[in-house]
């Protein structure tokens, strides 16, 4: 399965790519709630978010993905608020335990799978500093999410 997570207007995405039976598109429908940091997904019902807003099954979806594509406006070298919220709500994909990877502390993975991670940042005048911050963040995301391989692209416009 391929998951496309984006913050584009729906019409713009429809004009750019075709959905298939093997793809799932996650877009900002204004219904997502912020992670409460309650750790229900780790302690009470492992792998499942307590907030029932349609985004409570992200960990399960990630576990079935072969490829995750993120299309996000670049905000100071990071994701847009919607994309950041999706990634925050994906924490049930990980376990509440830690291990050392590359001399850094990271969560252990819940699912013994990996996927390809393709990230497209768009925006006018993305600075070199913002690009470096974004690259560093994506590399850390990839370690945390047990990503097999990844690509990062920076685009002036996403048409």
Segment roles from a protein language model:
Residues 108-115:
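Short, conserved loop/helix-junction motifs that constitute active-site signature segments
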Residues 1-68, 74-95, 143, 154:
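N-terminal beta1-alpha1-beta2 submodule of the flavodoxin-like/Rossmannoid cofactor-binding fold
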Residues 74-76, 123-128:
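Short histidine/acidic/glycine/proline-rich micro-motifs that form metal-
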Residues 54-57, 103-107:
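A generic local structural motif
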Residues 70-72, 94-98, 102, 121-123:
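Glycine-rich anion-binding loop/nest that anchors nucleotide
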Residues 90-105, 146-151:
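Short, acidic/small-residue loops that bind anionic groups at enzyme active sites
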Residues 1-5, 116-125:
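Short hydrophobic beta-strand segments
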Residues 1, 125-159:
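Glycine-rich phosphate/pyrophosphate-binding loop and the adjoining helix
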């Amino acid at each position: 399965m391929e998951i496309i997570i984006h913050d584009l207007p729906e019409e713009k995405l429809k004009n750019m790519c075709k959905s298939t039976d093997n793809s799932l598109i996650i877009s900002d429908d204004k219904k997502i709630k912020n992670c409460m940091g309650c750790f229900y997904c780790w302690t009470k019902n492992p792998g499942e978010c307590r907030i029932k807003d349609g985004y409570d099954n992200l960990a399960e979806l990630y576990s079935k993905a072969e490829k995750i594509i993120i299309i996000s406006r670049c905000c100071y070298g990071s994701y847009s608020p919607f994309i950041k919220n999706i990634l925050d709500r994906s924490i049930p994909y990980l376990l509440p335990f830690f291990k050392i990877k590359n001399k850094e502390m990271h969560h252990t993975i819940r699912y013994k799978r990996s996927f390809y991670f393709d990230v497209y940042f768009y925006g006018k005048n993305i600075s070199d500093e913002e690009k470096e911050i974004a690259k560093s963040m994506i590399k850390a995301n990839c370690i945390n999410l047990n990503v097999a391989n990844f690509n990062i692209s920076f685009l002036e416009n996403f048409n």
